[in-house]
Amino acid sequence: MKKILIIGAIILGSIGFSTSALAAISEQQAKDIALKEAQGGQITKFKLDKEKGRMVYEVEVIDGNIEKDYEIDAETGAIVKLEQEQKNHGNNNSVNNPKISYDKAKEIALKNSKNGKFKEIELKHKNGVLVYDVEIAEGFMDREFLIDANTGAILRDKKDF
């Protein structure tokens, strides 16, 4: 049983390593590419994922009532997919004006993590509060932090095994 767990840990560790190693462009470069093409707006979701055998950054940008979803090739920086949708957010434009930045929310989650690696972040409304939903990988476990986008307070710290 211990051998199986050790083998599983080695496999999972190498998958996590290879995922990062395959991303030739940085997270910041991917965000810059999406924001440049969108000509403004707020990044509301970001993650590195594998799609059809290649690593892509998935980036969601909201500008007013327009939502743009990008897939950016993590090796070349090319936009391989763009979907645009008109959204009705009512009179609530606060999704465009969080007081805490994406990078600050990520920093808060990583600071409260034990040697974790960033996986995903999404800006959304949860029970009427604008929050960043941040996923961090910690070995065999994932942690999900809900961080108030206006105060930086951690509203939830959930562990998934």
Please describe what each predicted stretch is.
Residues M1-F161:
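Long, terminal "pre-/pro-" and other extracytoplasmic accessory regions
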